[in-house]
C-alpha cells in the first residue's frame, strides 16, 4: 500500500519516540513515559515503597506508597490495576520543596492471594504520575504464612558415654516464613554463646562436642515463626560413665604370724564409679600372693648360778640369764627376776618390827570413815523429812501451772442436782476441783485478768489437790446412763476406719487413728437434755461413686459423720487431710456433700463463702477444717484452672522382708500425700510381707496431661539382672489425677545372678514428663537391713478414738467460759475477739465468726481442732494475755459466783 508523502514525518516521529521510550526503560526501571523536554528531577520518586509481607491467619495486610512530586498514585497487583475505591489517599505538600506529595494505602486480603493459582506469587506495585512522567515502585510479594504441626524429623532418646559426642537431629515442620529452631534442655533455653561445648548446625541439629554428666536431660526441639510455635517430643539423653579401677592398695600384712601365709591387696571400681547404667569394671578387685614370716622365738631362762658367799648384810644371791634361748624375731622377753637373794644366817639375823607410827595411822583412817558415814546418815534423814512436807495439799494453784489436765468435778453438797462427775483418764495425773461448774448461761459472766503472765487468777477459795484418781461410783453411774438411752441409732462396730461415741451437751471428739481425720463436737453443740451416738467413718474410694467432671480431682478422703438429721445448735468441725497445693490462681476448690437421695452437691465454693452459708472451711497447707451444723458425707474436690495446679504425691518403695527365690521385687507406690492413703498402703504391705527400703519422698504432680514415668538404673550387672523389657514404666495421667484409684504402683523385678547375693545398690527415678521428679539411691542388704522400719511407726493420735467431755479439749471448761465472756463484747480499744483472731492468723474469717452468737467460741473451737493433742497452751495464753484487759477485778471467779 502506498503512503502519502505527507505522512512520512509523522510515522518517523512515532518510531523515534518508541525507540527513545525503550532506551529509557533499559536505563532506569523506575522511569517511564517522560514528557519530551521535561526536567528529570521533577519525575516522581518514592519516599515509601511497598515491602514483602505475610498474611497471618485471616488478617489483611496493609501496603503503603508515598511519592513526591506526585499527582496520582495507583496500585497494580499481579498485572491488574486496583480499583480506585480501594485506595486510601492522603495529599500534602512537601515543606522543604513545596512539591505535591501523595500517600496511598490499600488492604490485601487472604482471599485475594488465594485466587492466584500455580507457581506465580501474588505481588503488588505502585505507579506514580507527575507532570514530568511516571515512576514504578519495587514489587512487594504477599504470601500466606503457616506452620505445619508435625516435625519432618524429631530427636530420639540416646545413651552415650562420658566425653562422647552427641548429635540430636531436628527437621522443623514446613512453613512460610521458614521456621526458626531453638533447643530446650529441661525446659531451659540452650544458648551456644554461653556454652562453647554446644552448637546448632545449619540443618538445626544440636551437637554436643563432649558429653558431660550435666548434659543428662530431656531435650526438646522448638520451631517457631510468626504464625505458631511447635514442640517436638522430648528426647531423654543419658550420659553414662563406665567404671574404672582405682590404684591398688598396699599389700596387707601376712595372714600367718609364723610360717607360710597369704598377703592381699585390693582396688575398687571408683575411678570413676559407674553411673547412669555404665559398665562395671572388668577384672578382679582382689589379688593374693604367698608370704613367709619368721617365727618369733620367746626367751627362756638359763639355770641359776651357784649362791654367792654370805655378805656383811647377812644375805647371799644367785643369778640367771634370758639366753636359753634368747628372744628373737619379736619373741617375748623372759618373765621373772634375773637375781635372787635370801638370808644366809637363818634365825641368827634380826627381823624388823612394825613401828608405833603405822598403828596410829590406821586408827586415824578408821575414825575418818566412821565420821563420814554418820554425816551421810544425818543428811538422808533431813531429806526424807522435807519430802514428807512436800506431799501436803496444794491450795490456790493455777490451773495453767497444773498442765491443763482433764477436770473431775465432784459435788460439794449432796442436795445440788446440777453437778456432774466425769470419769477421768486413769492413765494420767488429773486435777480435782472441789466446787460447782459455772455454765455460760447461768448467773453473771465471769471475767479474768489477761495483762499479767498467767492466763487466769486462782479459782476463788476452792481447794485443788493433785492426785492419781480412781473410778468413782458417780462416774460409773453417769456412763451407764449415757449407754442405756434407747432413742439413738445402732451403728456397726469393730472397723479400723470408724470411730463412734455417745455425747451430750458437754461435747467431745472422735478420731480415726493414723488418718488425720477427726470430728470436734464443741460444748453446747448438742442441745441440753439430748444424748446422741455419733459416728465418724472413712470410706474407700472404690466404695463411693463420686462423679468428677472435666478437670476435677479428688483432693481429700471421703468422710461421713452422722447420723444425718440430728439437731445441732453449734457447728461441729470436721478435720481431714488434702493433697492439693492451695493457690487461688491455680485451683477452684469445692466442698461436696452427698444428699439423702444419693446425689453429690456443691455446698461450698472456697473463696466465695458468705456468713449465711451453712458450711465454712478453713484451708491450710495439708488439712482442711469444715464447720457444719448438718452431718453427712463430705469430700474436697478441686478443679484445675491452669497447668500450674499441683497435687502432692507421696512416693514409697517396698520390697519383701524375706527373699527365698532368685527374684526380688521392688514396688514403687504413688499415692496421695495424706495420712489415710499412707495407712492403707502400710496395712497392705504388712499383709504382703513387705518392708520400706528407702525414705519416702514427695513429688509435685501438675495438671499438664503428662504421664508419670518410673525407671531403674545402675543395677550391677555382675550381681543382678533386670527383667524389665523397656527402659521405663508409665502410670497414665488420668489414673493419678482422678484421685479415686487406690494402691497405684509399678513393680521392678530383679533377678540375682547368685543366690548368695544380698547387697543391692541401684537408682530408681520417678518423674512426670516435663515436670517434677525424684531419685532414690538404694543401697540395701535384702536379708538384714531394717534401718527404715522405724519410718513406718505411725504416730498415735491421742489414744482412744472417742473422748467425751472435758478430756476432749486442751482448754479447761472454766477458762474457756472466761475467755468467751471477756472477748465476745466489742471493745473500743480492740481488746476483743477480732484482735484474738488476728493474733491466731484467722482474720480472713471475721465475717463468719461475727455471724455466730459467740465469735470467741468459734475461734477457740477452731484452735482446738487444729492443735489437739499437741497444742501449745502457752502460746494461746500469750495471745490472750497480749490483748491487754486493764481491770484485774474482771477476771476472778469464786464458788459463790458459780
Curated annotation (Swiss-Prot):
Residues 383-898 are cytoplasmic. Mainly expressed in regions of differentiating neurons. Expressed at early stages of neural tube development in the ventral spinal cord. In developing hindbrain, it colocalizes with a number of cranial motor neuron subpopulations from embryonic E11 to E14, while DCC is expressed by motor neurons at E12. Also expressed in non-neural structures, such as the basal plane of the hindbrain and midbrain, in the developing hypothalamus, thalamus and in the pallidum. One of its GO terms (cellular component) is neuron projection membrane. Residues 661-679 are annotated as: Interaction with DCC. Residues 242-296, 298-350 form the TSP type-1 domain. Pfam families: Death, I-set, TSP_1, UPA, ZU5. Homodimer and homooligomer. Interacts with the cytoplasmic part of DCC. Interacts with MAGED1. Interacts with PRKCABP, possibly mediating some interaction with PKC. Interacts (via extracellular domain) with FLRT2 (via extracellular domain). Interacts (via extracellular domain) with FLRT3 (via extracellular domain). This is Netrin receptor UNC5A. It comes from Rattus norvegicus.
Amino acid at each position: 500500500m502506498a503512503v502519502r508523502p505527507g505522512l512520512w514525518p509523522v510515522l518517523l516521529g512515532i518510531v523515534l519516540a518508541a525507540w527513545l521510550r525503550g532506551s529509557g526503560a533499559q536505563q532506569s526501571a523506575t522511569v517511564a513515559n517522560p514528557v519530551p523536554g521535561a526536567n528529570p528531577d521533577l519525575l516522581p520518586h518514592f519516599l515509601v515503597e511497598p515491602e514483602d509481607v505475610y498474611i497471618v491467619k485471616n488478617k489483611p495486610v496493609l501496603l503503603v506508597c508515598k511519592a513526591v512530586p506526585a499527582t496520582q498514585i495507583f496500585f497494580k497487583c499481579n498485572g491488574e490495576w486496583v480499583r480506585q475505591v480501594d485506595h486510601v489517599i492522603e495529599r500534602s505538600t512537601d515543606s522543604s520543596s513545596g512539591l505535591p506529595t501523595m500517600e496511598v494505602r490499600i488492604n490485601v486480603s487472604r482471599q485475594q492471594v488465594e485466587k492466584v493459582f500455580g507457581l506465580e506469587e501474588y505481588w503488588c506495585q505502585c505507579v506514580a504520575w507527575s507532570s514530568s512522567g511516571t515512576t514504578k515502585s519495587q514489587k512487594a510479594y504477599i504470601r500466606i504464612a503457616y506452620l505445619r504441626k508435625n516435625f519432618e524429623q524429631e530427636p530420639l532418646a540416646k545413651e552415650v558415654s562420658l566425653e562422647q559426642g552427641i548429635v540430636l537431629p531436628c527437621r522443623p515442620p514446613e512453613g512460610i516464613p521458614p521456621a526458626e529452631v531453638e533447643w530446650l534442655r529441661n525446659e531451659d533455653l540452650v544458648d551456644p554463646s554461653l556454652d562453647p561445648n554446644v552448637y546448632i548446625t545449619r540443618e538445626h541439629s544440636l551437637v554436643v562436642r563432649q558429653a558431660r554428666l550435666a548434659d543428662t536431660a530431656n531435650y526438646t526441639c522448638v520451631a517457631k515463626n510468626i504464625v505458631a510455635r511447635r514442640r517436638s517430643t522430648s528426647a531423654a539423653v543419658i550420659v553414662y560413665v563406665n567404671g574404672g579401677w582405682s590404684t591398688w592398695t598396699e599389700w596387707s600384712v601376712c595372714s600367718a604370724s609364723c610360717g607360710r601365709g597369704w598377703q592381699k591387696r585390693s582396688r575398687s571400681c571408683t575411678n570413676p564409679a559407674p553411673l547412669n547404667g555404665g559398665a562395671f569394671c572388668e577384672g578382679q578387685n582382689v589379688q593374693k600372693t604367698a608370704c613367709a614370716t619368721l617365727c618369733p622365738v620367746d626367751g627362756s631362762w638359763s639355770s641359776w648360778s651357784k649362791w654367792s658367799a654370805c655378805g656383811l648384810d647377812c644375805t647371799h644371791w644367785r643369778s640367771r640369764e634370758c639366753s636359753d634361748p634368747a628372744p628373737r624375731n619379736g619373741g617375748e622377753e623372759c618373765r621373772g627376776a634375773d637375781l635372787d637373794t635370801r638370808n644366809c644366817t637363818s634365825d641368827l639375823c634380826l627381823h624388823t618390827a612394825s613401828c608405833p607410827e603405822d598403828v596410829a595411822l590406821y586408827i586415824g583412817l578408821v575414825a575418818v570413815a566412821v565420821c563420814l558415814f554418820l554425816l551421810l546418815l544425818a543428811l538422808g534423814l533431813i531429806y526424807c523429812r522435807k519430802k514428807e512436807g512436800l506431799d501436803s495439799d496444794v491450795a490456790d494453784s493455777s490451773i495453767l501451772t497444773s498442765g491443763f489436765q482433764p477436770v473431775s468435778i465432784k459435788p460439794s453438797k449432796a442436795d445440788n442436782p446440777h453437778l456432774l462427775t466425769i470419769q477421768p483418764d486413769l492413765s494420767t495425773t488429773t486435777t480435782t476441783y472441789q466446787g460447782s461448774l459455772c455454765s455460760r448461761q447461768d448467773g453473771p459472766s465471769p471475767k479474768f485478768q489477761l495483762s499479767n503472765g498467767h492466763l487466769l487468777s486462782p479459782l476463788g477459795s476452792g481447794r485443788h489437790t493433785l492426785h492419781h484418781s480412781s473410778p468413782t461410783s458417780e462416774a460409773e453411774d453417769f456412763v451407764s446412763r449415757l449407754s442405756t438411752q434407747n432413742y439413738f441409732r445402732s451403728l456397726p462396730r469393730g472397723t479400723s476406719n470408724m470411730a463412734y461415741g455417745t455425747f451430750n451437751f458437754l461435747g467431745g471428739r472422735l478420731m480415726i487413728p493414723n488418718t488425720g481425720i477427726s470430728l470436734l463436737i464443741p460444748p453446747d453443740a448438742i442441745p441440753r437434755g439430748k444424748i446422741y451416738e455419733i459416728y465418724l467413718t472413712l470410706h474407700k474410694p472404690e466404695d463411693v461413686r463420686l462423679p468428677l467432671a472435666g478437670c476435677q480431682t479428688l483432693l481429700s478422703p471421703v468422710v461421713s459423720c452422722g447420723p444425718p438429721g440430728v439437731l445441732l445448735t453449734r457447728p461441729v468441725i470436721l478435720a481431714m487431710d488434702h493433697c492439693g497445693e492451695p493457690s487461688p490462681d491455680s485451683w477452684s476448690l469445692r466442698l461436696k456433700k452427698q444428699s439423702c437421695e444419693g446425689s453429690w452437691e456443691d455446698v461450698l465454693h472456697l473463696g466465695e463463702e458468705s456468713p449465711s452459708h451453712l458450711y465454712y472451711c478453713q484451708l491450710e497447707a495439708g488439712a482442711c477444717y469444715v464447720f457444719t451444723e448438718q452431718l453427712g458425707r463430705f469430700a474436697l474436690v478441686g478443679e484445675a484452672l491452669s497447668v500450674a495446679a499441683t497435687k502432692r504425691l507421696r512416693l514409697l518403695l517396698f520390697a519383701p522382708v524375706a527373699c527365698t527365690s532368685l527374684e526380688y521385687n521392688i514396688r514403687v507406690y504413688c499415692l496421695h500425700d495424706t495420712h489415710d492413703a499412707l495407712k492403707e498402703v502400710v496395712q497392705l504391705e504388712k499383709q504382703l510381707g513387705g518392708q520400706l527400703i528407702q525414705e519416702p519422698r514427695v513429688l509435685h504432680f501438675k495438671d499438664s496431661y503428662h504421664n508419670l514415668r518410673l525407671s531403674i538404673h545402675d543395677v550391677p550387672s555382675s550381681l543382678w539382672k533386670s527383667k524389665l523389657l523397656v527402659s521405663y514404666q508409665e502410670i497414665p495421667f488420668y489414673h493419678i489425677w482422678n484421685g479415686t484409684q487406690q494402691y497405684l504402683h509399678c513393680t521392678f523385678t530383679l533377678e540375682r545372678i547368685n543366690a548368695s547375693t544380698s547387697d543391692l545398690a541401684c537408682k530408681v527415678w520417678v518423674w512426670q514428663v516435663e515436670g517434677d521428679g525424684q531419685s532414690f539411691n538404694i543401697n540395701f542388704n535384702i536379708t538384714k537391713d531394717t534401718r527404715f522400719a522405724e519410718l513406718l511407726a505411725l504416730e498415735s493420735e491421742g489414744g482412744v478414738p472417742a473422748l467425751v467431755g472435758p478430756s476432749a479439749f486442751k482448754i479447761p471448761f472454766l477458762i474457756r467460759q472466761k475467755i468467751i465472756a471477756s472477748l465476745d463484747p466489742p471493745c473500743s480499744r480492740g481488746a476483743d475477739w477480732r484482735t484474738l483472731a488476728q493474733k491466731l492468723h484467722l482474720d480472713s474469717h471475721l465475717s463468719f465468726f461475727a455471724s455466730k452468737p459467740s465469735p470467741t467460741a468459734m475461734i477457740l473451737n477452731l484452735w482446738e481442732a487444729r492443735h489437739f493433742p499437741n497444742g501449745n497452751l502457752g502460746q494461746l495464753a500469750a495471745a490472750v494475755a497480749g490483748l491487754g484487759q486493764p481491770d484485774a477485778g474482771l477476771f476472778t471467779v469464786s464458788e459463790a459466783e458459780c
